[in-house]
């Protein structure tokens, strides 16, 4: 399975490079977050072994358990929604929270980060599709939340994040383009640099690269459609740490 992961990663990087060339971009400016939700620590270990340093998890407690099992390594991203009451554990677990979508959550994270003496990287999640089922704030509200975050200690605002609509990859282009335009407008209005556009998943990442993505969130494109059991050793193998 680690060999399959390496082969899939090579194919993904080829697609990223091709999309970057089409847009006149440097492919080295495009990072990959390996999404390991529901997969065991062995999958994270394999990702780190092939050079995927950025690990994405949807649930705070699941990520904390994996970090504890692995004993360190990687840069961990929260890519799922965060409730205010999980702020303390999130600050203890993640390096970058990509899904801040309210001042309430931002303040809870800032308070905890201040308490432990660290600066937590955060991005603002924007609902760029106007789909009421998706998380994220309205594009018109992103500037105000950015201003709030910049006024808080303990947080380092890095950019904006969005999730494209379901359907063909090309359907995501307007959302991705909107996010880039919004990021540029917020930078200009507030006089800050927001280097990250966190957008693009397994079904639409080439389009995201063409539209300026700097952090892709890839699960199936790297790990396939296998369930968590595919990463567990058989009876004759050693434990998961072997």
Protein language model regions, located:
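Conserved alpha/beta-domain cores
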Residues: 1-203, 209-211, 220-225, 234, ...
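Divalent-metal-activated hydrolytic enzyme cores
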Residues: 214-215
